[in-house]
């Protein structure tokens, strides 16, 4: 079985991928399309931008190579750090040599690697190409959503979505921004404004995809935090997977504020002191923005998010 778990950055999808990846016969693949996390992700970003926006009928040799590798279980390395280290070495090669080496390795991996019974691919860069992926690979699609204010607060702390406008990517602008009648933030926009705008854009696109495909699964990070064990078990069974004791153990341990997640570096997935004021991460995760943003910043983020047709995916839903 193939599963694509998608959402914005900081939406809780890493937590979910780690839990679901512990079901029997399952491999979780983290961010194969991330420009900073995978050499194929970097090569795709150089051609299509950080967030590719492909229509189902469009063809892309490099995007196809990326997802071919992802859905057989990713590169044959044990940890994400190994993929990043290898990618950094390869990226320093002359372009012609690098491209030839990477495509040879990618084709060999996708053809020869023995695929696990289940592969869960976790991605935060595929928002605008979900139909393209669904049409070619037929995975079960899972969209992870979260209160956008909590996403904005986390992104602001980590410097994610704060430096450039995703909506300035030509294909994203043409396919999403212009039809929505939106204008991207100016060059002097604050980090909170830019993060909120990018989160609003991505969340809108994810909501539209979910509305267009009622058969896709939508999971709420906020709901999972309220009662993690039974709700994760329900999500697991909804996907046709089996609940295991290892999954229960992970959910329980991950509630510890000192717990470090797997699937990213400490720099990318730190457990900041502002994530909780007590002994439970999940019990306060749904109000995280109140500790990470000032009241003025919350008001600023709300004002930006109000520009988007978020409906019941908005901050006050």
Residue ranges and their predicted role:
Residues 5-17:
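Glycine-rich phosphate-binding P-loop
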Residues 6-7, 120-124, 144-146, 220-222:
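Short His-Asn-centered micro-motif
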Residues 31-120, 166-186, 282-283:
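PAPS-dependent sulfation machinery
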Residues 14-26:
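A conserved segment at the C-terminal end of the G1
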Residues 14-17, 35-39, 127-130, 149-154, ...:
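Short catalytic/ligand-binding loop motif for oxyanion handling, primarily in non-cytosolic enzymes
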Residues 122-123, 133-157:
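Conserved phosphate-donor/acceptor-positioning beta-strand/loop module used by diverse small-molecule
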């Amino acid at each position: 079985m193939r599963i694509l778990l998608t959402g914005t950055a900081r939406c809780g999808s890493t937590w979910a991928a780690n839990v679901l990846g512990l079901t029997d016969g399952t491999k979780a693949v983290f961010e194969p399309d991330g420009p900073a996390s995978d050499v194929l992700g970097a090569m795709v970003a150089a051609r299509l931008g950080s967030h590719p926006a492909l229509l189902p009928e469009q063809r892309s040799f490099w995007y196809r190579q990326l997802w071919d590798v992802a859905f057989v279980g990713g590169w044959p390395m044990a940890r994400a750090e190994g993929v990043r280290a290898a990618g950094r070495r390869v990226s320093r090669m002359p372009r012609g040599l690098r491209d030839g080496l990477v495509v040879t390795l990618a084709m060999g991996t996708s053809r020869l690697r023995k695929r696990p019974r289940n592969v869960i691919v976790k991605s935060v860069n595929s928002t605008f190409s979900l139909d393209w992926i669904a049409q070619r690979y037929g995975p079960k699609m899972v969209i992870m959503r979260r209160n956008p204010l909590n996403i904005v607060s986390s992104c602001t702390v980590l410097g994610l979505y704060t430096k450039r406008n995703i909506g300035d990517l030509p294909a994203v602008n043409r396919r999403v921004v212009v039809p929505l009648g939106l204008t991207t933030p100016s060059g002097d926009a604050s980090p909170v404004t830019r993060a909120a705008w990018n989160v609003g854009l991505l969340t809108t696109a994810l909501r539209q995809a979910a509305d267009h495909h009622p058969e896709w699964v939508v999971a709420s990070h906020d709901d999972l935090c309220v009662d993690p064990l039974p709700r994760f078990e329900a999500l697991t069974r909804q996907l046709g997977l089996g609940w295991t004791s290892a999954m229960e153990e992970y959910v329980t341990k991950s509630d510890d504020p000192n717990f470090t997640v797997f699937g990213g570096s400490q720099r990318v997935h730190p457990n900041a002191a502002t994530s909780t004021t007590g002994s439970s991460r999940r019990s306060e995760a749904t109000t995280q923005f109140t500790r990470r943003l000032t009241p003025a910043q919350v008001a600023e983020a709300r004002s930006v998010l109000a520009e988007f047709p978020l409906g019941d995916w908005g901050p006050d839903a």
